[in-house]
Regions:
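Bacterial N-terminal signal peptides that target proteins for export
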Residues: 1-6
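Sec/Tat signal peptide C-region and signal peptidase I cleavage site
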Residues: 15-21
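N-terminal secretory/targeting leader peptides
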Residues: 22-115, 124, 130-339
């Protein structure tokens, strides 16, 4: 009798413990970027984690895996497959999962961060990310600034597209970036990020392109003599979530997570723009010859590169998608500048 009662009590406690465990949600979040821990993106992620855990009264725990589960491509794949619950990724890899997302890599799509922010929060972007969710099971919670990309090299100042001719330039492993470099007359060499510094040090390539914050944080300035702030492509970060997992959460928890993701975006946006200016000045002080390209020079780069990349992306994502992206970017520009 006693043994029966003991077993019954143990079973009751186990069930109660199970119910308590089910009440608390543990979410796995990973970052596939190489940003410094004090970078705007990283500060935004910390703000998001703290907000979600505080607002849920500890019922949601966010476990951070920082650069331990691969780069953006790997963490995006993990979110798609459900190995990760959510993650920060960048728009340059999403074209591998949903081809229309390649269209955001068009050179000189945005004249400023303010226009890009307007675009990211606009109706068209909501439609694009919703289409991606339906096609892939990857839900987008928020978009934020990754930054404008600039050119560095070890051979000469780059003021116009003609200065690019003959340079061997490292690119991401992306056909869009290869098309961009080739349109300027440079020899594009796709190299994985971990091998970039060795390639620059040994002159396998003459230069590379990246956000100023990356050039500073990764110490690329130590092996490059020249930098051109030509802001040729704007990079976006996205907080993505496995759609099935998100739908399994309570409405209250969904709302808190969405709010946290938006807090990340607002925090990152305000910090990223400042960080880029500070990094550029630090690079100059470190001895690199920095040229800030004029609007006239940027227009030369746009004319030389944009159509070639647009034509390539149209073969991948469709001309109608490219036309819609260009129209939405123009709409965002008018919303900011009023003309």
């Amino acid at each position: 009798m006693f043994r029966t009662l003991a077993l019954a009590a143990a079973t009751t406690l186990a069930l109660a413990g199970s119910a308590l465990a089910q009440g608390k949600v543990q979410l796995r979040f990973s970052v596939g970027a190489n940003d410094h821990p004090t970078d705007g993106m990283a500060v935004g992620i910390k703000a998001m984690k703290d907000y979600i855990e505080f607002k849920s009264n500890g019922q949601i725990e966010v476990r951070l895996f920082w650069n331990t589960m691969g780069g953006s491509l790997q963490v995006t794949e993990a979110v798609k497959n459900g190995t990760l619950d959510f993650a920060l990724t960048d728009d340059s890899v999403l074209g591998s999962f949903h081809k229309p997302m390649q269209a955001f890599q068009i050179p000189y799509l945005f004249p400023s961060s303010a226009v890009a922010w307007e675009f990211m929060n606009g109706r068209f972007m909501k439609e694009m990310t919703e289409e991606m969710r339906k096609a892939t099971g990857i839900r987008t919670l928020a978009l934020s600034e990754n930054g404008f990309r600039n050119l560095t090299n070890s051979r000469r100042p780059i003021k116009t597209p003609d200065d690019m001719k003959g340079l061997k330039m490292r690119t991401m492993q992306s056909q869009v970036y290869v098309a961009f470099m080739q349109s300027l007359g440079a020899a594009a060499t796709p190299i994985a990020w971990p091998e970039t510094m060795p390639a620059l040090k040994t002159n396998v390539v003459d230069g590379q392109e990246n956000a100023s914050t990356t050039v500073w944080d990764a110490k690329i300035y130590e092996v490059q003599k020249f930098m051109s702030v030509n802001e040729h492509i704007y990079g976006m970060h996205l907080i993505i979530f496995n759609d099935a997992k998100f739908n399994s959460l309570s409405p209250d928890h969904q709302k808190i997570i969405q709010e946290g993701a938006r807090l990340h975006a607002q925090t990152a946006n305000s910090r990223k723009a400042f960080d880029a200016m500070a990094a550029t000045e630090n690079i100059r002080k470190a001895g690199v010859e920095v040229h800030v390209n004029t609007p006239t020079e940027k227009e030369l780069f746009r004319k030389a590169s944009q159509q070639a990349v647009v034509d390539f992306i149209a073969t991948q994502a469709g001309k109608d998608v490219v036309d819609k992206v260009l129209a939405a970017a123009e709409e965002a520009r008018k919303a900011v500048y009023g003309n």
